[in-house]
Every structure is written in C-alpha cells, then in structure tokens.
C-alpha cells in the first residue's frame, strides 16, 4: 500500500528568544504524524536563504510569521497532499519549484524547511524508524563530537566580549556520553570560577555564560582554569574552539575589537588568531574573517589550515554552490551546516555530501533562536558530519539535542562509535 501525505498544518509558535517561528505538522494516510520546528539566527550571513517575516510592527514587533504560515497552507499543502511520502528529495523539489528563487525570497526558507523536516519525520513515523535510520540506513553510526559554547559574546550576549562563542571540545573520550559528562562538569566548574572572580554568571542566547571580561583572550584563560579544576587535561581530553563571527566587527577594511580598543588589517588579524592558537589548545576557528574577505581567508588557510580546523559559516551559508567556490579557491577546510541557511533538508544533505567529497569537515549546527526540535542530532548521526554545535550545557532548547544524542547512543549500543579526535581530520594527534 502506498503511503501518501494527507494533511499539512502550520502553527506559529515561539522560539527560545520569545520570537515567533513555524511549527509544521504532517499527517500521512496510514495515520502517522510528526512535526518539526524551525530555528532562527541572530548573526546571519548576507547570502542566507530568506527567513520570511511579516513586517507588521503592530504584531510581535514585526517578527510574526503569518505570511510563511499562509504559504504552507496555500502553496505547499495543496501541492503535496496526495503525494507518496517515500522520495523526500522529490517532495522538496516541488516546493523549491513553487518558490522559484535562489534564496527562497518568494515563499520563505522557514516555510519550506518546516515542511521539509516534518515530511522526513513523518516518513520515519510511518516506517517506525528513527530519523537517522531513515536518512541513512546502515549497520554502524558515528556520534558527533560536541562543540560546547560555554562563554557567549558578540551578537549572542550583552557584554564586552567581541568574539561570539568560546567553546570546549571534548574529543579525547571513547563515548559521546563520557564527552557530555565532561562538558557538563566543566560548565558547572566554570560557573564557580566566574563567581569567585566576581563575574556575572547570567547566560546568553545559547546557554553559555556572558561575563564582562577585559579581553577576548581572558575568556580562554578562565575556561582553561575551569578545565583544570574539573579534573580534565586540556590539549589531551578537552580542546578549545571559537566562533569569531568576524563579519560582525568588520568595518571599513578593519577588524575592530572594541574590548581591546584595537583595529586589525586582515593580515594582522590572521596573526592575532595564530598567536592565540600557539598559546591555547585551539582546534577550530569559525568565521575567523569577514564573509567577503576571500583574500584574507586564503591567507588564514595558508597560515593555519594544516593544524587548525577553519570553519566557514557566514562564508558558505550551507550553500553548495558557494562551498564549491571556496573549495576551488582553497579557502577554509570545514563548513558549518545550518539547515535554515539553505532552507530544505535535501539541499542540506547535498552540501554535506559535497564537503565530504572535498575532504572538508562538516559541523551540524543549531541557531541562537531554537525550539525543542532535535532534528539536527539525527542529521549529525546519519551523515558524514562528525561534529555538532548545539550550545551550552544549559537551557532545555540546547540540552534537548544532547539528550537526543544520548538516546541514540543508548539504542544503538555496540553499533555506535564516537568520532573523537578523528573528527578533526588529522588536526588533533591521536
């Protein structure tokens, strides 16, 4: 019996920042039902697919998503109801054709993605299989290394720190559950260290602490203290990573670090980052330069690419065409994967496959405005992405993804392995 789509319903819900977003539910002809929530970013790349907002200042301060909801109801539901559920990519193509634009500016990436993810989940419900097994049926699966954002700055926090994310990377363990435990213990130890220094322990959008610090380097220093006090070995069990989000402090050809009252040329900022990497066990730098500073990116890649993971987020925006441009120019060596940057599940998977073919690491990522949806955890397990960014060890919208990965590891048993240091393609010595 062919299982078909019988109902698609969209609802305006709130994300973790209290802003509206879409939740889409799909019902199939066999009675199976699933739903998905759509995340939203704060620090966004200029070439991301369009997140359609209403712009009505009298409602949710202009951030409502009734237009996107209407597009689900009036465009996608009529086009998809009655179609077989089996070929998810074909269903995505129907929606993409209806939109007809490169950046989903007609019907909205949030509308398309909500339906795309809900369709995939509904297929899993019908087959009585977890989403990761629907996306990639195989005998063994790899659990990703988490990149845990424990100090927030930049656009993710109201503090004096320029760099947006300071992360711990527990790559020196045998199981995901062990890595998660280490991250949790370091997070709570960091809170104690900050309190002892009279610093703020309020958290930012992604659950990390947001203290006022005298410099960006001071964030690494206090994290190193927390790692040691928690009983772990930095550079062996726990590594560091950062998301500079450099596009946010790039003006008139210079990188302006307000907390340090300094401005750098591209070459000088590459030297600044290289110096940090010499003094701290930093294994990954995301968006180290402005998204349009391709010459600077080439310099950064030449300087650090052999020993540090250089991740393009705003640079590549999960877009396979832009990633291919970067591959051709020898820029970066990894890509951040955010499904809502491109706007459909099938295009997300296509970009991950391209990265893998080019030997670029792929890191699945949340957004700063999240929901309880855990789809990205399943995508990380199903694909060749060996790392995941889903925030700190705080806030249920972040922890939900970690708990989903714990559940997957438990149900797979001996069929699961942890990516560990191998996730970084030789950047960490085993």
From Swiss-Prot:
The active site is at 206 (proton donor), 338 (proton acceptor). It is found in: Cytoplasm; Secreted; Cell surface. GO terms for biological process: glycolytic process. It holds the Pfam family Enolase_N. Binds a second Mg(2+) ion via substrate during catalysis. GO terms for molecular function: magnesium ion binding; phosphopyruvate hydratase activity. Keywords: Cytoplasm, Glycolysis, Lyase, Magnesium, Metal-binding, Secreted. (2R)-2-phosphoglycerate binds at residues 164, 338, 367-368, 389. Gene3D superfamilies: Enolase-like C-terminal domain (3.20.20.120), Enolase-like, N-terminal domain (3.30.390.10). Its cofactor is Mg(2+). PANTHER family: ENOLASE. This is Enolase. It comes from Dichelobacter nodosus (strain VCS1703A).
């Amino acid at each position: 019996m062919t299982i078909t789509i019988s109902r698609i319903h969209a609802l305006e819900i709130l994300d973790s920042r209290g802003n509206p977003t879409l939740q889409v539910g799909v019902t199939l002809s066999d009675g199976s039902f699933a739903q998905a929530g759509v995340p939203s970013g704060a620090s966004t790349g200029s070439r991301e697919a369009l997140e359609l907002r209403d712009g009505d200042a009298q409602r949710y301060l202009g951030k409502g998503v009734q237009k996107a909801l209407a597009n689900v109801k009036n465009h996608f539901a009529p086009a998809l109801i009655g179609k077989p559920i089996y070929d998810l990519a074909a269903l995505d193509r129907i929606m993409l054709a209806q939109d007809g634009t490169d950046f989903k500016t007609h019907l909205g990436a949030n509308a398309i993605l909500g339906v795309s993810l809900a369709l995939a989940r509904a297929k899993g419900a019908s087959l009585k299989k977890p989403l990761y097994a629907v996306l990639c049926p195989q005998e063994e699966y790899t659990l990703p290394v988490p990149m845990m954002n424990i100090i927030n700055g930049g656009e993710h926090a109201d503090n004096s720190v320029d760099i947006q994310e300071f992360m711990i990377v527990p790559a020196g363990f045998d199981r995901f559950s062990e890595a998660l435990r280490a991250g949790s213990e370091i997070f709570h130890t960091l809170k104690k260290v900050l309190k002892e220094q009279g610093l703020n322990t309020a958290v930012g959008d992604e659950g990390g602490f947001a203290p006022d610090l005298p410099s960006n380097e001071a964030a690494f220093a206090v994290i190193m203290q927390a790692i040691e006090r928690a009983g772990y070995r930095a550079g062996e069990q726990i590594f560091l990573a950062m998301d500079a989000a450099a596009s946010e402090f790039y003006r008139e050809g210079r990188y302006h670090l307000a907390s340090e009252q300094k401005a750098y040329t591209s070459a000088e900022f590459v030297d600044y980052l290289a110096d940090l990497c010499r003094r701290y066990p930093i294994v990954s730098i995301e968006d180290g330069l402005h998204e349009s500073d391709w010459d600077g990116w080439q310099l950064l890649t030449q300087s650090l690419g052999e020993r540090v993971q250089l991740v393009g987020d705003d640079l590549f925006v999960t877009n396979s065409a832009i990633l291919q441009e970067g591959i051709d120019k020898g820029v970066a060596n990894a890509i951040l994967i955010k499904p809502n940057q491109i706007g459909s599940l099938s295009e997300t998977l296509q970009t991950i496959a391209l990265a893998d073919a080019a030997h670029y690491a792929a890191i699945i990522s949340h957004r700063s405005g999240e929901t309880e949806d855990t789809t990205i955890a399943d995508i990380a397990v199903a694909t060749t992405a060996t790392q995941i960014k889903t925030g700190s060890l705080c806030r249920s919208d972040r922890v939900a993804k970690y708990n989903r990965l714990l559940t997957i590891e438990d149900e797979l048993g001996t069929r699961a392995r942890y990516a560990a240091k191998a996730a970084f393609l030789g950047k960490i010595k085993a």
